[in-house]
């Protein structure tokens, strides 16, 4: 067991004096310059949370004892002088920036062995391997397990996870101060809400950092168990043909299981497990017996309950068969139906009927979630009828057409691998008429009049045809190729999933 504990000692760079860039204010500005966030983008921060304000606040921290007042008067909201609640939010934003920079440098800097990490996690940084996985491996798997990641985690568990990385004592005093302050603040105004409700709405950077750190911790343990179980060597037992030796075999098995951990993992050798984390959920895809699948289910539950002190019931993990279950994944609606075909075979004077079961992958564009996403972004109403975008009405005609065309191309590029494209054509119709209504609203004209004008100028050809899809890869033979081929094409240059998938 000691040799496996050595594997569980994860490679962590334990930082000392992590609060130095925050308190010595000149360093944080230099650190943050040129190091944009690797983990999040378009977070919609309020303008008041900027590095300049954090820098000014650090100057005031030396002039007055704000932390003492901040710790004692958490229920007060001053109207004259300093607003400590406002300052605490700014400090927390600056704290999140500093910690994120340090961890991003560890993951992506060559000086901290970042090249090895990038090579080992190369498949996790892009979406290239998802579509070949659909075609080549998914149809040969049997079961799928939906895992809802339990949170919020207890705050002290988060601090313990951070202690593996950081040795700065003042850092833990500060972060406990923040947790205590916001917990008391939320319990005073909203007694039934957790602290993560506040973090997720107002301090998204530090919330995402802590959440990703928590998920990374349990995924590291799970991947360790999965890798060790698949790399175990076979341990053969003697074959006992007589019944009198049966109990001797059981006794021998129990003794081995209690002495060495590797023999207990023997039962999980050569299992086919594919793990994907997507939008707060994890997906495990198996090709094995239900007995082993249930064992991994209980491993997950015990890991959360024993290691993270989070209650996770059996309803947290759902196991379903592919042949009887369809699911949403990365913006697609996937199903693997069983197609039964009968083949007649004749041998001499005898004829046989052979039934062959063939699995086929169906990738369908989910029309209802996409229409809901378009309704939230004001491209159509809740019934799916196109509406104009008044926010874009002050732009030029070229910018309006360019924006709609870019969105339409992204949809075409992402969903061209769908087997049934009727839903995709409906989405394209909504975008096309939303563009026309926006232009007609700008020029104070009717839709019919402006549609005739655009048709005469041939400005909407790319909305009406699909040649622009093939021109992205086949610029010369796009017209001929697009006319004769209407099959499923996966584009392997997609780096990010479609933005509208976030609203699913």
Swiss-Prot record:
Keywords: Chloroplast, mRNA processing, Plastid, RNA-binding, tRNA processing. The keyword Chloroplast applies. GO terms for molecular function: RNA binding. It comes from the Eukaryota. GO terms for cellular component: chloroplast. It holds the Pfam family Intron_maturas2. One of its GO terms (biological process) is mRNA processing. InterPro entries: Domain_X, Maturase_MatK, Maturase_MatK_N. Its main location: plastid. It is found in: Plastid, Chloroplast. PANTHER family: MATURASE K. Belongs to the intron maturase 2 family. MatK subfamily. Usually encoded in the trnK tRNA gene intron. Probably assists in splicing its own and other chloroplast group II introns. This is Maturase K. It comes from Vigna subterranea.
